[in-house]
Amino acid sequence: MLSPKRTKFRKYHRGRLTGKIYLIDKVVFGNYALQSLEPGWITSRQIEAARRVITRYAKRGGKLWIRIFPDKPVTFRAAETRMGSRKGNVEYWVAIVKPGKILYEVLGISESIAKYSLKIAGYKMPIKTRVIVKI
């Protein structure tokens, strides 16, 4: 699973999911991309599951770019613990995604396979997504 090697602080506040991408996020590396349509947290496991789907359909031919990285730790306190007494342990890492963010890009595979694999990868995400084509 993806996680940062080191961070400035071990634990962070949860924060709020407000706003959108102000600079329009474009397809930079590949020809086809998966774009988010709503805000959310995407865990490192979900990123890995979608990566596996895309690489399985691309076989040996294509190249894949993952444009998000899980750099926010999510903590949980143990069950039946009293209030107070510090923050819980880091359980997993998430990437903060806003509407319009490019999640994955592919290059070097046919249009039908690229669109289909990105569509299936979108089903692995906890947010609505769409497949876009580089103009």
UniProtKB/Swiss-Prot annotation:
UniProt-listed HAMAP family: Ribosomal_uL16
Name of protein: Large ribosomal subunit protein uL16c
Record-level Gene Ontology MF annotations: rRNA binding; structural constituent of ribosome
Keyword flag Cell cycle: no
Gene designation: rpl16
Classification of source organism: Eukaryota, Discoba, Euglenozoa, Euglenida, Spirocuta
Single GO cellular component term: mitochondrial large ribosomal subunit
Keyword Plastid recorded: yes
GO biological processes: mitochondrial translation
Organism domain of life: Eukaryota
Taxonomic source organism: Euglena gracilis
Subcellular localization(s) per the UniProt record: Plastid, Chloroplast
Protein family per UniProt: Belongs to the universal ribosomal protein uL16 family.
Matching InterPro entries: Ribosomal_uL16, Ribosomal_uL16_bact-type, Ribosomal_uL16_CS, Ribosomal_uL16_dom, Ribosomal_uL16_sf
Pfam family, one: Ribosomal_L16
Keywords from the UniProt entry: Chloroplast, Plastid, Ribonucleoprotein, Ribosomal protein
Record's subunit section: Part of the 50S ribosomal subunit.
Main location per the UniProt record: plastid
